[in-house]
Amino acid sequence: MSNTETANPTAKAVARHVRVTPMKARRVVDLVRGRSVEDALNILKFAPQAASEPVAKVIASAAANAENNLDLDPSTLVVATAFVDEGATLKRFQPRAQGRAFRIRKRTSHITVIVESLPKTGTSTRNRRKGSAQ
């Protein structure tokens, strides 16, 4: 899969209907956006949030897609784009006193990660974007 914004090759992975709320998953995704895949996986390994496990799986899957489908070097991969969309909401009821029932919304997420292969110059996409904005 080629990205029209950059000349660098990209690979994508998506996890749909993950049983974690989008707000909590976005906190985890914000930790790793713009970092190398190796750094991102190390950060997520020790992150205390429950959403770090599915996000790490998606990043590892995107890296595997880049390595197997596009023959890219895993050491040059950077998490270029990562975002979380809201999935379907499972609606459940919590019984309450006197015949009442409260609704429980079990939210799901769609986690998307796009990894990009950068030349071995050592600059990350985060540094490049900051320089171009000025």
Swiss-Prot record:
InterPro entries: Ribosomal_uL22, Ribosomal_uL22_bac/chlpt-type, Ribosomal_uL22_bac/org-type, Ribosomal_uL22_CS, Ribosomal_uL22_sf. CDD domains: Ribosomal_L22. Keywords: Ribonucleoprotein, Ribosomal protein, RNA-binding, rRNA-binding. PROSITE patterns: RIBOSOMAL_L22. GO terms for biological process: translation. The keyword Ion transport does not apply. One of its GO terms (cellular component) is cytosolic large ribosomal subunit. This protein binds specifically to 23S rRNA; its binding is stimulated by other ribosomal proteins, e.g. L4, L17, and L20. It is important during the early stages of 50S assembly. It makes multiple contacts with different domains of the 23S rRNA in the assembled 50S subunit and ribosome. Belongs to the universal ribosomal protein uL22 family. This is Large ribosomal subunit protein uL22. It comes from Rhodococcus opacus (strain B4).
